[in-house]
């Protein structure tokens, strides 16, 4: 379907109205701290951490005090949820220690989310006990072909998280010009079957020098149509619809969840994404507000549960 067409605009309008109705016209900004950089042997071709891409040749983790400071800053700036992100090969027990320390420092009702590699039931329970409310996890486009992870392994992690009482957010990503309609439909239906607290669609960011960079990027206009279709397909049982990176067109088309980022970022060759691709909480809020959304204040409404720990 042409991006500039009456039909495309009708789809985006319908998606916007659905999100407005399910979320009460409200939007959220979540904030992620990437706690480490490392050459990752899972070798997701689209990722700046992939060992094959030779962007980060060293392993380095932030000191816990810096992670806590960054999380508290995000909390103070009005982020509705705080995410800790680590590479897939980051030691799980060390990640749990980070999580416990951050959980203790944050307000009791602040939502804490893990964005990490795969884990089993024992790991899911440990995350819950450490104070995490949920996880971000996606079965990415090209999973098993352009990544070193089998799709079933990703699904096993989602199931383990749900059994442990962790809520799951996900997304159809990373969308590139090479992806077919059939691939997008497959991942959209899979997203719906995951029964997430939020869904959406995000484009692949072309990282210079990587194998996929030559394929280019999907335009924000095309992504607005894709995220609108995902929104409608997932249905009214999911109130929040995300896109990344934050942009005005997506917000108009029904995206009501953006991320601010600092620290490491798998779409960024810079070690500190706040100096390059990362958005601030204030900028995300500004884009959403300009698109006519009312901002949620306080803890995330998408992740409506407490945590043990």
Q: What is each PLM-predicted segment?
A:
Residues 89-91, 144-145, 157-183, 201-216, ...:
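Conserved strand-turn element in the central/C-terminal portion of the radical SAM core barrel
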């Amino acid at each position: 379907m042409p991006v500039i067409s009456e039909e495309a605009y009708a789809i985006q309008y319908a998606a916007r109205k659905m999100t407005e109705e399910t979320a009460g016209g409200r939007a959220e900004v979540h904030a992620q701290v990437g706690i480490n950089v490392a050459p990752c042997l899972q070798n997701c071709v689209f990722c700046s951490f992939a060992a094959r891409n030779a962007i980060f040749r060293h392993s380095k983790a932030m000191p816990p005090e810096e992670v806590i400071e960054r999380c508290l800053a995000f909390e103070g700036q009005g982020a509705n949820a705080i995410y800790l992100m680590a590479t897939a090969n980051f030691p799980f027990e060390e990640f749990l220690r980070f999580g416990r320390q951050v959980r203790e420092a944050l307000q009791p009702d602040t939502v804490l989310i893990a964005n990490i590699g795969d884990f089993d039931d024992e790991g899911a329970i440990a995350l819950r006990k450490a104070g995490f409310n949920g996880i971000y996890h996606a079965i990415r486009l090209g999973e098993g072909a352009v990544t070193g992870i089998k799709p079933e392994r990703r699904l096993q992690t989602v199931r383990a998280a749900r059994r442990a009482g962790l809520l799951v957010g996900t997304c159809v990503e990373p969308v590139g010009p090479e992806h077919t309609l059939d691939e997008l439909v497959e991942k959209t239906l899979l997203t719906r079957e995951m029964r997430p607290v939020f869904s959406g669609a995000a484009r692949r960011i072309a990282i210079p020098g990587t194998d996929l960079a030559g394929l280019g990027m999907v335009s924000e206009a095309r992504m607005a149509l894709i995220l609108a279709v995902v929104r409608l397909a997932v249905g009214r049982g999911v109130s929040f619809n995300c896109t990344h990176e934050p942009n005005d067109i997506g917000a108009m088309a029904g995206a009501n969840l953006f991320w601010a980022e600092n620290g490491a970022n798998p779409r960024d060759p810079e070690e500190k994404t706040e100096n390059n691709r990362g958005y601030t909480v204030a900028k995300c809020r500004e884009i959403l507000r300009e698109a006519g959304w009312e901002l949620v204040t306080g803890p995330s409404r998408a992740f409506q549960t407490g945590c043990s720990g």
